[in-house]
Design a protein with these regions (language model features):
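Inter-motif core of Ras-like GTPase G domains
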Residues: 2, 18-36, 46-56
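Short, high-confidence coil segments that cap the C-terminus of an alpha-helix
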Residues: 5-6
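Walker B catalytic acidic pair
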Residues: 12, 59
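Conserved ATPase-coupling elements of RecA-like P-loop NTPase cores
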Residues: 15-22, 40-43, 67-68
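Residues on a specific face of well-ordered alpha-helices
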Residues: 24, 43-46, 50, 69, ...
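Short, acidic/turn-prone active-site loops that include or flank metal/cofactor-
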Residues: 34-39, 61-62
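Long, well-ordered amphipathic alpha-helical subdomains in the mid-to-C-terminal portions
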Residues: 95, 106-179
Length: 179
């Protein structure tokens, strides 16, 4: 945004910490899935599904169209098992094909609807405020960590060696570090 872009897309490589970080910096969190990839409704996806404002099943074309529609129905059904979003938005589930360029417009419509919903109800601005607070605290943590490690590097290395040599337990080493 600072560079003047109105739309910024952020892609992550999988399920993990990166998605949590990305969720704290975006207006709409879109989960892109593939039908038949073996991860439909797995427990590992639960956390990321709860964060999603929308789920799109891509590659809904050719022989994969029917499995994609089936996955769409499964995800729609599964979303009812999760707690509702605090902003009242009900996550949408769609299918699309980047290859055949089908239903991409519907994907943009879902993003637009979610954005409009949150803006009209004041959640857009409050989410931005919460994101700013989150990043402020992240920056504090990073700065404190950097400062602490640089000031105690030698002591940490010595205690670390004692832990590795089983002369101290990790908790004992921690107590010594903070004396």
């Amino acid at each position: 945004e600072a560079a003047g872009f109105e739309i910024i897309l952020i892609e992550t490589v999988g399920v993990g910490q990166s998605e949590t970080a990305v969720h704290s910096m975006v207006d709409v969190f879109l989960l892109l899935m593939l039908a038949g990839a073996g991860d439909e409704l797995q427990g590992i996806k639960r956390g990321i599904m709860e964060m999603a404002d929308a789920i799109l099943i891509n590659k809904a074309d050719g022989d994969n169209l029917i499995p994609a529609k089936k996955a769409q129905a499964q995800y729609k059904s599964a979303l009812h098992l999760f707690p509702p979003n605090t902003n009242g938005w009900i996550p949408q589930v769609g299918v699309c094909s980047a290859l055949e360029k089908t239903d991409i417009d519907k994907a943009w419509d879902i993003i637009g609807q979610c954005t409009k919903w949150t803006q009209e109800r004041g959640f857009f601005e409050s989410k931005r405020q919460e994101q700013n607070r989150y990043w402020f605290h992240q920056m504090i943590k990073e700065r404190l960590q950097d400062d602490f490690y640089s000031q105690h590097q030698q002591q940490i290395a010595e205690l670390e060696q004692q832990v590795m040599d089983a002369k101290l337990s990790p908790s004992q080493a921690l107590q010594q570090l903070f004396k």
